[in-house]
UniProtKB/Swiss-Prot annotation:
GO terms for biological process: translation. PANTHER family: MITOCHONDRIAL 28S RIBOSOMAL PROTEIN S6, SMALL RIBOSOMAL SUBUNIT PROTEIN BS6M. This is Small ribosomal subunit protein bS6. The lineage of its organism: Bacteria, Bacillati, Mycoplasmatota, Mollicutes, Acholeplasmatales. It comes from the Bacteria. SUPFAM superfamilies: Ribosomal protein S6. It comes from Onion yellows phytoplasma (strain OY-M). Signal peptide: none annotated. Belongs to the bacterial ribosomal protein bS6 family. InterPro entries: Ribosomal_bS6, Ribosomal_bS6_sf, Ribosomal_S6_plastid/chlpt, Transl_elong_EF1B/ribsomal_bS6. CDD domains: bS6 (cd00473). GO terms for molecular function: small ribosomal subunit rRNA binding; structural constituent of ribosome.
């Protein structure tokens, strides 16, 4: 299993229930054994450095996880089909 750092940004026009639902869906991928969430931070609504899909703000979320390849593939699949996610980055840690 490898360690990954993940950051994703949600559309700013979502209400808190929708933000929580999406966060829970994405985090559940890493809550199934043997995967685990090491750290998480729901940063909240922040200004974007530049417009993304005509949005000036977005809900930022950050995760540090240990995951196998299947979890990484499932996370990427979910992110790509979820329209509320306007940007994401998935980085493998050096460990």
């Amino acid at each position: 299993m490898k360690k990954y750092e993940i950051m994703y940004i949600l559309r700013p026009n979502l209400d808190s229930k929708d933000v929580k639902k999406i966060n829970d869906t994405l985090q559940n991928v890493f809550l199934q054994a043997p995967n685990q969430i090491l750290e998480q931070n729901e940063i909240g609504l922040k200004d974007l450095a530049y417009l993304i899909d005509n949005h000036k703000k977005g809900y930022y979320n950050w995760l540090m996880v240990k995951a196998d390849n299947d979890a990484v593939l499932e996370f990427n699949r979910i992110v790509k089909i979820t329209e509320e996610i306007i940007r994401f980055i998935f980085i493998k840690d050096k460990e």
